[in-house]
From Swiss-Prot:
Function: Binds medium- and long-chain acyl-CoA esters with very high affinity and may function as an intracellular carrier of acyl-CoA esters.
The protein's name in its UniProt record: Acyl-CoA-binding protein
PROSITE patterns linked to this entry: ACB_1, ACB_2
Family of the protein in this entry: Belongs to the ACBP family.
Signal peptide positions on this chain: none
InterPro entries attached to this UniProt entry: Acyl-CoA-binding_prot_CS, Acyl-CoA-binding_protein, Acyl-CoA-binding_sf, FERM/acyl-CoA-bd_prot_sf
Swiss-Prot/TrEMBL keywords: Lipid-binding, Transport
GO molecular function, one term: fatty-acyl-CoA binding
Binding sites annotated in the UniProt record for an acyl-CoA: 30-34, 56, 75
Organism: Brassica napus (Rape)
ACB domain boundaries: 3-88
Length: 92
């Protein structure tokens, strides 16, 4: 399986987590996903009254230097960590 297919598979797996990831984890995933699928940020930073959009933009901007492959790989790693954490908490 290629990196792109693995990435797409993990993008689906993350939707099936029974417990919602923390906001921090969601922002990390968002930034990596956008970097992997869109590339570097091309929009201006949202205003201070759009806190949610601003946080998402900041998360994307934070990974701006990563290549598509790096972002995909990091996204897969993060999803695996979340899946493992969920599995270990379910078995505990």
């Amino acid at each position: 399986m290629g990196l792109k297919e693995d990435f797409e598979e993990h993008a689906e797996k993350v939707k099936k987590l029974t417990a919602s990831p923390s906001n921090e984890d969601l922002l990390i995933l968002y930034g990596l996903y956008k970097q992997a699928t869109v590339g570097p940020v091309t929009t201006s930073r949202p205003g201070m009254f759009s806190m949610k959009e601003r946080a998402k933009w900041d998360a994307w901007k934070a990974v701006e230097g990563k290549s598509t492959d790096e972002a995909m790989s990091d996204y897969i790693t993060k999803v695996k960590q979340l899946l493992e954490a969920e599995a270990s908490s379910a078995s505990a």
